[in-house]
Amino acid sequence: MDDDAPKAAPKAGRRAARTANTWGDDSAAPPEPQKGGFGLDSGFGGGGGSPRGNAFGAEDSAPPKHVASTNFAPSGDDEPAPAPSRQRTGDASGDRPSRGGAPPSRPPPAEILGEDSKKFVGVSRRKQEQLARGDDEVSRKNLKYETLTAGVDGIMEIPELEEEGREDLSNIVAEAPKVRTNKVQGMEELEEDMHYKLPAMDDRDIDLSLLTAVLCSSEQVAEAEDPWDPDIVLTEVASAINAEREKAEGGEAPDDMGGMRDEQGMPMPIKL
């Protein structure tokens, strides 16, 4: 070919980027970077035409795992394709998938809560699980309380004694009214109580000198054992009475014997 031949006009779009990276006439031209989804270069995609990508083969052609893949559909238009939206994997709950594999799918809150899901409308899933867990704990406590308070089967009920007594009046025995009376102690009981309650007194603790000074001796009180003649005793008593009477009237004084005497000096008999 002749060197003076006119060169082909550069192509625009993705084809221009591919031809610029080849070892053709435009090898000196810098590759035009193409922006992919989320600001990533299209050179990291599957259609990269860089010398490094051509040298290493198909290893660099596949997109890395940590970068979202961009799909470029070949088209005849020169306009760049719109940036594809990032595909979100996983559940709608927002859980991120693990690198090793897809996580086990969790049951929706409606399956966990069951029939009570209607009362949790408008509540987040985490709050719904917490409320359901609290309801389970409350029901478990109530079940434990019911088992403790429940009666044991097989035990006979003992009827009340009051009802049996009211039904059968023949078993009731009439009793006298109970009247509480205070018992009065007698003298003997009081003396016994005083004997045991009072402290013991000894004669040695009492001074009897004042009492013995006034009293007579036992010798003065003693009398001779002489038989009494009732006639003589009565005569002496009558003469003493007459003497006191005459003395009061101013008559003769009675004698020592206490009797009255006549003119001859003989005692006069007293007539009773």
From Swiss-Prot:
The keyword Lipoprotein does not apply. It comes from Chlamydomonas reinhardtii (Chlamydomonas smithii). As a component of IFT complex A (IFT-A), a complex required for retrograde ciliary transport and entry into cilia of G protein-coupled receptors (GPCRs), it is involved in ciliogenesis. Involved in retrograde ciliary transport along microtubules from the ciliary tip to the base. This is Intraflagellar transport protein 43. Residues 1-138, 244-272 are annotated as: Disordered. The lineage of its organism: Eukaryota, Viridiplantae, Chlorophyta, core chlorophytes, Chlorophyceae. Residues 126-138 have a biased composition (Basic and acidic residues). GO terms for biological process: cell projection organization. Component of the IFT complex A (IFT-A) complex.
